[in-house]
């Protein structure tokens, strides 16, 4: 993604400030596998990825490409458009009749919260196995975005919120 941003928009590492971004040098895993074993999957040098505020990145891209991009916010089929490139941001399929994968996915809900800070405390995506599911933490410049994925048919949101507080206290 950083290479694509650079080649299409001349987006540099310095532009990360404009989208509240931070460098991502790997993925840390805690509590997965053997008890007490944590590890970081580092990206080999010089590879790096980005964490960024998605809304700010969207605004940045649209401001750079305002005269080159037409945003269509409507329910249309791709054959109704004459375009070189189409990005479908509609999310899940309109009908889920043939798209039910719930029996394959053990989590079906997420609780997202933020913790404010004045600078990123780490340069990787943090993933932590927890009793009710798993947690991701994404560091941005002014905050850390934390999501707790769990199964709402087995656990309660209250239990998940208490466990998130335990993680913050750690």
Briefly describe each language-model feature range.
Residues 1-37:
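N-terminal FAD cofactor-binding segment of flavoenzymes
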Residues 13-14, 32-33, 50, 134, ...:
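Tryptophan-centered motif/residue detector
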Residues 17-24, 47-52, 101, 127, ...:
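Short, charged/polar micro-motifs that form catalytic or ligand-binding hotspots
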Residues 24, 169-170:
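Flavin (FAD/FMN) cofactor-binding core of flavoprotein oxidoreductases
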Residues 28-68:
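Mobile amphipathic helical/loop "lid" adjacent to a hydrophobic cofactor/ligand pocket
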Residues 59-168:
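Predominantly flavin-linked oxidoreductase catalytic cores and closely associated redox partners
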């Amino acid at each position: 993604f950083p290479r694509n941003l650079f080649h299409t928009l001349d987006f540099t590492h310095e532009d990360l400030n404009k989208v509240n971004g931070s460098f991502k040098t790997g993925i840390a895993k805690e509590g997965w596998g053997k008890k007490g074993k944590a590890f970081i999957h580092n990206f080999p040098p010089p590879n790096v990825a980005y964490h960024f505020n998605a809304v700010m990145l969207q605004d940045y891209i649209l401001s750079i490409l305002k005269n080159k991009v037409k945003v269509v916010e409507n329910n249309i089929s791709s054959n109704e458009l004459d375009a070189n490139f189409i990005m479908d941001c509609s999310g899940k399929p309109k009908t889920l009749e043939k798209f039910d994968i719930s029996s394959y996915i053990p989590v079906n809900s997420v609780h997202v919260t933020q913790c404010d800070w004045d600078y990123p405390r780490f340069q990787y995506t943090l993933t932590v196995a927890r009793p009710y599911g798993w947690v991701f933490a994404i560091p941005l410049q002014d905050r850390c975005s934390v999501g707790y994925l769990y199964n709402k048919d087995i656990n309660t949101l209250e239990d998940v919120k208490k466990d998130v507080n335990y993680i913050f206290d750690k």
